Design a protein with these regions (language model features):
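Charged DNA-binding/catalytic regions of mobile-element recombinases
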Residues: 1-162
């Protein structure tokens, strides 16, 4: 969550672990399940996963992620839920890393925050920058979008006969 002069703003991210790309996000004035559902819907729209594609959604035990509505939506999309252990940040290490980067690179650096709209717009800008320009060492010091493009281009290359 982010403190503003008008109250708190809650932010949720959905991350494609293979690509290390943020594929869904949402900011909200409340911490209700609907805002994390919106982030999930954005990710589903962006990725259009195949039903039965062995997709796993890992989250912490936040009330939004273990809610009936959220669990039902995962089941409808054919996604297997996986919930981490209580108090174990290593269970959700990538999400914890993304949240830490977001807070360091946006929230602490550019605050204090006036209102919801300021946080939402800054988050939009940061997600675009993160996906398309931020260099990530684990994927070869390239942005997530470029790493993903290279991977799919490699799959499309005809294999060389021996």
């Amino acid at each position: 969550y982010v403190a503003t002069w008008q109250g708190f703003v809650y932010v949720a991210f959905v991350i494609d672990v293979f690509a290390r790309r943020i594929v869904g996000w949402r900011a909200s004035r409340t911490a209700h399940a609907s805002f994390v559902l919106d982030a999930l819907e954005q990710a589903l729209h962006d990725r259009r996963p195949a039903h039965g594609g062995d997709l796993v959604h890992h989250s912490d035990r936040g009330v939004q992620y273990v809610s009936i509505r959220y669990s039902e939506r995962l089941a409808e999309a054919g996604i297997e839920p996986s919930v981490g252990s209580v108090g174990d940040s290593y269970d959700n290490a990538l999400a914890e890393t993304i949240n830490g980067l977001y807070k360091a690179e946006v929230i602490r650096r550019r605050g204090p925050w006036r209102n919801f709209e300021a946080v939402e717009f800054a988050t939009l800008e940061w997600v675009d920058w993160f996906n398309h320009r931020r260099l990530l060492e684990p994927i070869g010091n390239i942005p997530p979008a470029e790493g993903e493009e290279r991977y799919y281009a490699m799959l499309d290359e005809p294999s060389m006969a021996a």
